[in-house]
Amino acid sequence: SLEIQVLVPIQEHNEFNFNLLKIESRLKQDSYFVHMAKKTYPDNEPYFAITASIASFERTLVSNQSRFDYYLNGLGTLNDQERLGMELFFSAKTNCSHCHGGFNFTDYSFSNNGAVTIKNDSGRYRITHLTSDIGQFKVPSLRNVALTAPYMHDGSIGSLKEVLVSYNKGGNNKAYTQNHLIKELQLSDKELAQLEAFLNTLTDYNFIQNPKFKH
């Protein structure tokens, strides 16, 4: 759940590396927080209000006004390059949409996309201890992907173009748990540019410029 996910970046050593109880202690000094926490979650401890309220906010972060969305709903157009990139994205030639499908361009699964360096982070294996999970990470949404560099779970790829080049050659790491769909695609530079153009249409400026999300 999102409530559980909230705990990860707070406590993970390579993210915030902090302690939820220390956050609770600090927030107890804030009379407004204490008042709102009791009002909203009267039967729960303050630390519950922290995770529950952050998760509630995260559920409001819905992006659905990109150029692609307008095109899909008959309210806008894509140019030829973007349209050809869209056709490639949803084609059997690339299989991009196999993992990055649906409204949020993710199937919410875990997968090894050939970017992992096992010695630094073994992925889902850290939790399950199943060898089949070595190098598997959550498939991310591609909405607003043009704005979220650097890419991959470890930030090892600096640009969207480099990501596409990596997939085109079948990944950067041939680990044995790599998804069977990650293989050489043999796309031309022109086709890679078309894919990148399509991915840029997933940017939702109404979402990213919403003043409610600035803080």
Q: What residues fall within each predicted segment?
A:
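Periplasmic c-type cytochrome electron-transfer domains
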Residues: S1-H215
